[in-house]
């Protein structure tokens, strides 16, 4: 597969997942797009072989998570302020926007595990490998993240019957 075909394959297969994961960390669309581009450039320059598509996906999401952590630690990010005073055009809210807003307001370590578990469908052990933390830590973060969401959303209104 030549470089152009590889780039198209990566963009088609992983761009959405990288953008969504990056946005859960950074809460900024432009920064998430920068992370996506950075990950693709690294992948295209290193030409790594993977055992399976699952290993490739986990490696790519791990690269994205690490790149997000690097941005969050950077001194540049600490010196800039988001444009919170900018006017957002009114748009109809999605039915689950309150839940999504609550998830996005969680601390990054809870937000990442909840995103990977519920939106990407990873198991706790896989999330641990992607984020570089023990499986028990993933379970703890999921439980604490759910508890915070329940407290934010008022509990029963959003709970689904089992």
What label would you give each PLM region?
Residues 1-8, 80-82, 93, 129-130, ...:
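C-terminal edge and immediately downstream basic/flexible tail or linker adjoining helix-turn-helix-like DNA-binding
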Residues 20, 34-41, 54-66:
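Structural recognition of an alpha-helix C-terminal capping motif at a helix-to-coil junction
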Residues 113-117:
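A short pre-motif secondary-structure segment
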Residues 51, 61-83, 144:
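Arg/Lys-rich amphipathic alpha helix in sigma70-family domain 2
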Residues 1-20, 33, 44, 111:
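A short, charge-rich alpha-helical start-of-domain segment used by transcription regulators
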Residues 70, 78-103, 123, 162:
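Internal acidic/polar
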Residues 65, 69, 131-155:
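DNA-recognition helix of helix-turn-helix
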Residues 27, 38-55, 75-76:
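Sigma70-family region 2
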